[in-house]
Regions:
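Acidic, PIN/NYN-like endoribonuclease modules and their adjacent C-terminal/linker elements
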Residues: 2-3, 9-24, 29-33, 37-39, ...
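Short, hydrophobic beta-strand segments that form beta-sheet elements in well-ordered domains
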Residues: 8-12, 57-60
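Acidic, metal-binding active-site segment of PIN/NYN-like and related structure-specific nucleases
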Residues: 51-70
Length: 96
């Protein structure tokens, strides 16, 4: 468990990851759940801005969000097709 939990914002495509991260000690939130609680997080801009204002790391599959974070020095973990491909390759090694 991290000493100073990082604040993490999980984009809606990976709703549920926030719960898994919280279970191991991270301070994680889901865009989908925050929206259900009444926060106005309906656009990419508002999601990125929320992460920035709350000093959170954004976890997303949205390439444009990843690029926007990179351009504006906002911490982001982009789960794009290239990252997923690397995971698949790693798992395929188990079958060789």
């Amino acid at each position: 468990m991290p000493k100073n939990p990082l604040k993490i914002l999980v984009d809606e495509m990976d709703d549920g990851m926030d719960e898994k991260l919280r279970s191991i000690g991270y301070d994680a939130f889901s865009v989908k759940k925050l929206r259900a609680d009444g926060l106005k997080l309906h656009t990419d801009f508002s999601v990125i801005n929320y992460a920035m204002e709350n000093k959170m790391i954004l976890v997303t599959r949205d390439t444009e969000n990843g690029q926007a974070c990179e351009e504006n020095n906002i911490p982001c973990i982009l789960l794009d097709s290239e990252e997923i491909f690397k995971i698949v390759l790693g798992k395929l090694k188990d079958y060789n």
